[in-house]
């Protein structure tokens, strides 16, 4: 039965990917065809699918509609758009060369139909809703490494250390270097195949540490720009800033400060300028008991805890420690509710200083459930909030992870909340799973300390402008080596490059994982992204793309004569092969990411460390779950 369900699960995903990804291409070509017929051009053939013709379906307005062997996308044959002064049909009949205006209309119609299709889907998802991160105006730094390992020489990010300075270890290099002084040299022994390789490594200074960032700092902005979606939005802004220097706007002990530094390329993130420090969105309350101190203070489910008096709250455990230090004295809490900061004052908590006595519980929620592991079999679902395990109050995901491992497969009782109703699961046993570097007991869930994702309802225009902004920023960073030379502006070395892009292979893989982890909502969200992006990319004025045909047509209208067809043909041919080479280049990196994902369980190529493996699964193992979202009706 499980095998049949797995086959059915894989089948619907394949059908979804092939149909909708192919439809993005199909609708593009369909737009070209309709515009060509409207402008009176000769349309030779319209194919559903690619490759050799399998079957001629029918003929309409002298256009052969055919079905091709590869059931993916489609194409339209328009001989009058070829760069020649004597276009011909397949029957060798001569045709009139296409004039500039009809050529521009036909070229624009393809991207235009992609945009129309995107808006149709965006309008539907406006009503249905899309997965979004809950609003959070800040994030909390949990750790900042003092030093970094040098991966530029002998050390590799996939190396597993067996000894450091002669002492046996099973830690990763970045974990050891985090507490070492920069510029110090150490002996490192790693396992490569069946051999132990020993060499010297000098630690590098971490610019984040030297700029003054520390664990417990609360980040409220980057480069002066504030965010509303917590750590995910912060990290995107950080990576896509493209600036030579980055300024992290933070708060410590109630006082704001700025940390400015030159970001380094992060080898653990494919050389992107991603932070080396770790941070999370603020810890959130999963609920508040009636008539409790928390309820009387005005706290509500979903509130994100930022500060107790002037001390930043790093997590649930730290909150209880701060609560105990108050020893019954009144205190204030700074919280975020629906994206707005609120100060609650005069709060008291009587002894003993536990969450139960305070009258609240944290939102340690299930982000995804792995098929064929105990959590799935026990009935745990995405969106469930875990309250306790074997009667032990849950403070954060790390606590649950450590407890699950300690049970070594013994039955557990898990208390959780689903749709506001308490639920108790008895006899849940973790399962021993062999992983890179050893075995670990897993429950089979991905946990989040912050509030779970919600279903938002962004209007179609908001969805479109967000994708246009993302695409524009990406293209700006890709072309920054050229633009920086022209403008003289310093650019960051840790920036987005061509190898960070995804081609068809990467997009298809991403769609599979998105369908597995976020279901149809996530899948349609990605299709909207793809069809809008396809339109934008095709409008670029690059030979062989639609945008260049539009540009050539505008030039011809202005100069009132046709551009030399040999020049146009040469440019189109050269750039066609350059684009083909670019696709091969990007596909190589897509393949490398997938290989690392399958081998290490990490798309970055870093094998998971057994002692730190959360009960998470790699994206490949995640599955579409019954969605138990928090609904928000706000339109943006």
Residue ranges, per PLM feature:
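Functional transmembrane alpha-helices
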Residues: 2-4, 8-10, 93-101, 270-296, ...
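Conserved PDZ fold ligand-binding element
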Residues: 151-170, 211-231, 294-316, 377-397, ...
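Small-residue-rich helix-interface/hinge motifs
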Residues: 8-90, 537-559
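PDZ-domain C-terminal substructure recognizer with occasional recognition of PDZ-binding tails
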Residues: 178-206, 214, 220, 236-275, ...
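PDZ/PDZ-like groove recognition
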Residues: 121, 125-163, 195-215, 269-301, ...
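Terminal peptide-recognition signature
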Residues: 28, 67, 150, 158-161, ...
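Internal alpha-helical transmembrane segments
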Residues: 27, 74-143, 254, 319, ...
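Low-complexity, proline/glycine-enriched hydrophobic segments characteristic of transmembrane helices
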Residues: 139-218, 334, 343-345, 406, ...
